A protein has these predicted regions:
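Long, compositionally biased tandem-repeat segments
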Residues: 1-569
């Protein structure tokens, strides 16, 4: 309520037969002193992509940034991409606005979507960069870029997002009243004093830009769309990194997206990685990595992978600032006959949590979806990031006082192939902290259900093991997925419960259900985790098939504690 960073919004679900992908969840608002959470990515849609979630606002007295907006989901056949989410606002006194999410692409005659607007900063801090507009690869117009946030007292205005082909660039924000450079594409000022201020700053910047390739004060330039150019680095003192340009379009294989530029040394947000270009008949381009922050600031989100026969992998999220700031989320994998893998979340700084892993890309009905990216590791005192669908959760920081490892992502679903195994929960801190829960197995319409991921182990002294993820149920004659094992506790704590096995389908009378996961063991004082129940056979166990074996309960502590109960069959 007071100091904790807000939670990350959930990823919107993909749409197969329906029209629109699910919208990403909004990032949570920070506590009184906490940073805002990142908005979740929109799900890909058969016609229209889901909108990215808005970034959460930081707490009123926070020294952290507003959360970044989520990336809009892609349209796969005939519609429009989903709009990027708006960046959250920073706290009252210090912190930068969150970056707007990139607009989703359209793979057909529809238009790409608009990028989200950048958030407002505190009295000292940069306005958030606007998100890049999404491209259209089938003859439609590219989406416009999002507007940059406006500086207040000291800090730069956010740069407007770059519009994709035929899409307009977003309007840049103006710099702070005392000190700060206007963002790229900001309108000309009608104030003589402001114009004089900008001229003086540009004169000071010129030798630094010429000799080092980055200004003293100001934002890095955005990479040109369609070239895969990297975004420029923010100013030596303060400034946001530029967004990477989208990868090349029109070749057999799509080009890689450009990396986001690094944030300024004192404060500044890393630029968002450019999305990978779509491949006409080959591989989708890899999304660009998000730019890293240095001292105070958030890492940029990784770019989405391009669509293709094999979807491109999403880019990795940028690392948070060494002292304060949120780590960037990994980019989503591109859609294809085989979906691309999501990018890994960035690592947290001293007090920051790891970034969320990106979701895997949608696979065709006969192919497999991509695996989600791993959550980033927490900083020295931070919690691990949540894994994308099927990705492992990040480990908590070594000296975290009670922060948990990140939860493993649920396994990706498939129409015909087996469901993806759920991600492993991240480990707690070295001495304190509980393990993250394992992710649930991915559902399959006609293949075997995915197994649940194992729960993460707790810290050595105090903490409970993470619960194992449940195995996914299967339909038809396929087999349910096995439940994940529970994590081991610390010296004082409870073992994690094993996950339940998945059931078989109604017509699968002679196929057994999935195995229940084994409960995690306690160490000195604490109870062992309960074993998971075995999955039912076909027709809820009434059609002659055998249920899955149950999981054994974990051992209790050596000094005090009961063994966990065995699961039911």
């Amino acid at each position: 309520m007071l100091f904790g960073a807000a939670g990350v919004g959930g990823v919107g679900g993909f749409s197969n037969g329906g029209a629109t992908g699910g919208a990403g969840g909004a990032g949570g608002a920070g506590g009184l002193f906490g940073a805002g959470g990142e908005g979740g990515s929109g799900g890909s849609g058969n016609l229209t992509g889901g909108a990215g979630g808005a970034g959460g606002n930081a707490g009123t007295l926070a020294t952290g940034d507003g959360g970044a907006g989520g990336t809009g989901g892609a349209s796969r056949s005939g519609g429009f991409g989903g709009a990027g989410g708006a960046g959250g606002d920073a706290g009252m006194f210090f912190g930068s606005g969150g970056s707007g999410g990139a607009g989703g692409i359209s793979r057909s005659v529809g238009d790409g979507a608009a990028g989200g607007a950048g958030g407002a900063p505190g009295l000292i801090g940069n306005g958030g960069n606007g998100g890049n507009g999404g491209a259209s690869t089938g003859g439609g117009d590219g989406g416009p870029g999002g507007a940059g946030g406006t500086g207040v007292l000291i800090g730069n205005g956010g740069s407007g997002g770059t519009g994709a082909t035929l899409g307009k660039a977003g309007i840049g924000g103006t710099g702070g009243v005392l000190l700060g450079l206007d963002g790229f594409t900001a309108p000309a000022s009608t104030s003589p004093l402001h114009t004089l201020q900008q001229d003086v700053i540009n004169m000071v910047n010129d030798p630094f830009q010429t000799l080092t390739g980055r200004p003293l004060i100001g934002n890095g330039a955005n990479g040109t769309p369609g070239t895969g150019a990297d975004g420029g680095a923010g100013g030596w003192l303060f400034g946001n990194g530029g967004n990477g340009g989208q990868g090349t379009i029109g070749g057999v294989n799509g080009g890689a997206g450009g990396a986001g530029g690094a944030g300024g040394i004192l404060f500044g947000t890393g630029g968002t990685g450019g999305s990978g270009g779509p491949g006409a008949t080959g591989l989708g381009g890899i999304g660009g990595a998000g730019g890293a922050a240095l001292l105070f600031g958030s890492g940029g989100a990784g770019g989405s992978g391009g669509a293709g026969a094999v979807g491109g992998n999403g880019g990795a999220g940028g690392n948070a600032g060494a002292l304060l700031g949120a780590a960037g989320a990994g980019g989503a994998g591109g859609a294809g006959a085989v979906g691309g893998n999501g990018g890994a979340g960035g690592n947290g700084g001293l007090f920051a949590n790891g970034g969320a892993g990106g979701p895997g890309g949608f696979g065709s009905p006969a192919g497999a979806g991509g695996i989600g990216g791993a959550g980033g590791n927490g900083g020295l005192f931070g919690a691990g990031g949540t894994g994308g669908a099927g990705g492992a959760g990040g480990d908590a920081g070594l000296l975290s006082l009670g922060a948990s490892g990140g939860a493993g992502g649920s396994g990706g679903s498939s129409l015909t192939a087996a469901g993806v195994v759920g991600g492993i929960g991240g480990a707690g801190g070295l001495l304190f902290g509980s393990g993250g829960a394992g992710g649930s197995g991915g559902f399959s319409n006609s293949g075997n259900g995915g197994a649940g991921g194992a729960g993460g182990d707790a810290g050595l002294l105090v903490g409970s093991g993470g619960a194992g993820g449940a195995g996914a149920s299967a339909t038809g004659a396929a087999t349910g997925g096995d439940g994940g094992a529970g994590g081991k506790s610390g010296a004082f704590g409870l073992g994690g419960d094993g996950g339940a096995g998945g059931a078989t389908g109604l017509s699968g009378a002679f196929h057994i259900g999935g195995k229940g996961g084994v409960g995690g063991s306690a160490v000195l004082i604490g109870n062992g985790g309960n074993g998971g129940n075995g999955g039912n056979s076909g027709n809820a166990g009434k059609s002659g098939g055998a249920p899955g074996p149950s999981g054994a309960g974990g051992a209790g502590g050596l000094l005090l504690g009961e063994n966990g109960l065995n699961g039911l069959m």
